[in-house]
């Protein structure tokens, strides 16, 4: 039955695929029946979503720094338009997850947050003060004495995972000592204390963040560390103009990191480019440190491709995954697309959207390599930005282009994506009148086009936004994300899913819950030879195009195969993987 169903589904999918490929991409507006069918198919899928009550062996958190709702929507359209579609009708990978919620991002002392305090919230489960990292609200900005007090330190979910015997990893396109990754291992009264050269008089007596990563718990036990920031470790190559944090103590912390692993009898490697990363054999490597830039990693569009270049976010995530999957007890992995934030601070929407698409690519690649029955995957942002989508552009209008209507005040065009503040403030005075720059005189689709902003914010940086951000989840206990939550709830929900940290002894599932993986699983009642673990080969991984076809043509598949046939197999893990790559809700 299984192989018959497999052949039938693939046959129908192939017919659909050939039918689509044979037709040129259409940018026509959809008719009435399209919307009716789309809604009915989505309703059918929603009615068949099941909650996964398993204990998560693995937890993977993807963080799009600054990827608020507007940035997410713009990235979705941008992705679709790069594929030749109108754009609005598409999806980012995580938008197909079965569970979603909103998160309130404010800090203890700020209505609009920064990335250090938000990282402390979603990684440590405690909201805290602006610009502080891995400490509770008893520590105010720059208070070194309070920041040293271990009573005020907030352990992260990465530390909880280590205490449960899991391997851990952090991957980022920013400096590895930056706010998001830093909250997994560091405790600092000031997020800028990334190296001793930045401590100043306020930080005398405090340990810098890079030093904490190399020598303190839990940093020195992190199995995979991939990102930028060689300067903070005293290992800068000196070939970059940006100097952000220069060590004054003369130490090379990358060598100290290697020495620590050697002392503990572990195999460890330090790499600085794509070629060296590619050559790493996961089976021969216990610890991996990769620092690919003196400061932040290059933007995706600037990244040098080749052995001497920098790895992409996807490259780093997949290498980290290969090392961490060796752990019999599972793992926790944080993957940050951190430069979305930097582009938005500069009012550079094209760069920001390219970074978001790089994150989308990383998420899609990782989903193919993990078992979603035992892996919780969440995708979220730490905060938003003040970018807006405005005007009334036509359907399919280039997301980086101009709105067709002119302003009735100054009779000038404007772009769909603009900012309420930032360095894009671009006005001049002509005969005692303030005149806005005409964006039609430049290429607004250029990678370095700076969108207009209403208010200048010195010195050059746009601010964050204070509205809620979204979180998407799939896998064990993903249904815990279900409404508007405080941002610090995220760490608690992830810990409960994996039965670690505060939930190590308190992660009971209700009596009606069913389990297919892990310590709470009941004996299988599936037919012999069905499903994973039976020794039979898994179905081949679906291409994104074929996956989208299956998602969008559920009713056609039901019609072709018959309702009873579909019902007979839609609950098996194998066909769930075929129809949804195990990362998406049931299609039938």
PLM feature spans:
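N-terminal secretory signal peptides that target proteins for export/translocation
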Residues: 1-4
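Cleavable N-terminal signal peptides of Sec/SRP-targeted secreted and luminal proteins
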Residues: 6-22
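Structural beta-sheet core signal
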Residues: 61-62, 170, 379
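His/Cys-centered metal/cofactor-coordination and adjacent catalytic loops
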Residues: 134-151
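Glycine-rich phosphate/pyrophosphate-binding loops
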Residues: 153, 158-159, 163-183, 502-507
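Long, low-complexity, intrinsically disordered segments
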Residues: 560-588
